[in-house]
Amino acid sequence: MERVLGIGGYFMRAADPKALNAWYLDCLGMDADEHGLWRQEAGPTVFAAFESETDYFGSRSQQTLLNFRVRDLDAMLAQLRAKGADVSEDIQDVEGVGRFGWVTDPEGNRVEPRQPV
C-alpha cells in the first residue's frame, strides 16, 4: 500500500496574503525562502479529526487549527506578545503530551504553539 510521507504544505486564504505571510515569518521565527519553503525540524505530527461542533478551534467558522511545535512555550508566547500579537492568557498542560498556548493571527485564525514533553 502506498503511503504519504508527511505534510507537504499548509495553505490558507487571506484578505492580505503578503501581510499574513510576513506575520508568520516574523512573529513565529519561521525561516522560509521567497517561495514559502520552510524546512521544519524532525518531530511527530498529529493528524486528528474533531467533532464539527467543537469550540477548540476558536471561531466556529475556522475549519482547521495549525499547531506548531516549539522548544519553550513561555518564550514563544512572550515573543508573540512583544510583537503585539493577540495571545491568550490560557495555557493548558496535558500530562504526557505537553503544554499548549494560543495566539490569533491578523486574519483571525487561532494558532496553537505546543511545547512537547
Label every model-predicted segment.
Residues 28-63, 103-106, 110-117:
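Conserved short beta-strand elements that form part of the metal-binding/catalytic scaffold
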Residues 24:
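Terminal peptide-recognition signature
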Residues 16, 72, 105:
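Acidic di-acidic motifs
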Residues 1-9, 78-117:
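Vicinal oxygen chelate
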Residues 21, 31, 85-88:
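A generic "structured core" feature
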Residues 1-21, 64-66, 117:
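N-terminal beta-strand motif that seeds the catalytic metal site of vicinal oxygen chelate
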Residues 59-85:
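Mid-chain, well-packed structural core segment of small domains
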